[in-house]
């Protein structure tokens, strides 16, 4: 595993390389955010952004979505993966928001994961982006990049999240989440990483091996 002082240098370089790194899902409030994140599972943010404008125009509030027929909702999101399941989930989510939380998205982790269709990653994104809480949400990009370059060495998403929280200062958690996502999308591709133009290649275990990195 990379030493902590080098981890700090890696994070600095990633922040310099991706100063624009932020949540790529278009939203105007926390309700729209949680719906968009729930829809983004196994789907690109770009695809979600193509369907949410019409969806949010038709169902602008939790109350409106809670009263919707899932089949009608599905028609708005059929261009994304698992749209039938997701339409049922976001309607059920809205119903629970209205019945249990006064129509407001809660800012508590346990409350969030009690909502249909909301897992650990979605809850962490909402808490970080929507409420400004320090969180590291581990998606496929964060998992791949963090383990590939040697920030952590873990086999699953939860262990990766906990290990990153241990290695990275809390005040950098949210920023690191976005930087790793942008690096995974733009440079550290799953199949063909662009190591020749990578801003952190001198530190990367994938490039240099665990004994020679840095």
Please annotate each region the language model reported.
Residues 2-213:
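Catalytic cores of DNA base-excision repair glycosylases
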């Amino acid at each position: 595993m990379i030493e902590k002082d080098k981890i700090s240098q890696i994070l600095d370089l990633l922040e310099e390389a991706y100063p624009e790194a932020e949540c790529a899902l278009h939203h105007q409030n926390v309700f729209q955010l949680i719906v968009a994140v729930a829809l983004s599972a196994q789907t690109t943010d770009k695809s979600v952004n193509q369907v949410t404008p019409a969806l949010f125009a038709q169902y602008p509030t939790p109350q409106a979505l809670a009263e919707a027929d899932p089949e009608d909702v599905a028609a708005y999101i059929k261009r994304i993966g698992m749209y039938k399941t997701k339409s049922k989930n976001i309607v059920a989510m809205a119903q629970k928001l209205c019945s249990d939380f006064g129509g407001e998205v809660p800012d508590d982790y346990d409350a969030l994961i009690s909502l249909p269709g909301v897992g650990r990653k979605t809850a962490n994104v909402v808490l970080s982006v929507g409420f400004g809480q320090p969180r590291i949400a581990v998606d496929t990009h964060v998992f791949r990049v963090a383990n590939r370059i040697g920030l952590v060495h873990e086999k699953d998403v939860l262990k990766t999240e906990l290990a990153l929280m241990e290695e990275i200062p809390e005040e950098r958690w949210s920023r690191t989440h976005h930087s790793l996502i942008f690096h995974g999308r733009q440079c550290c591709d799953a199949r063909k990483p662009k190591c020749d133009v990578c801003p952190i290649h001198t530190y990367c275990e994938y490039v240099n091996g665990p004994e020679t990195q840095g």
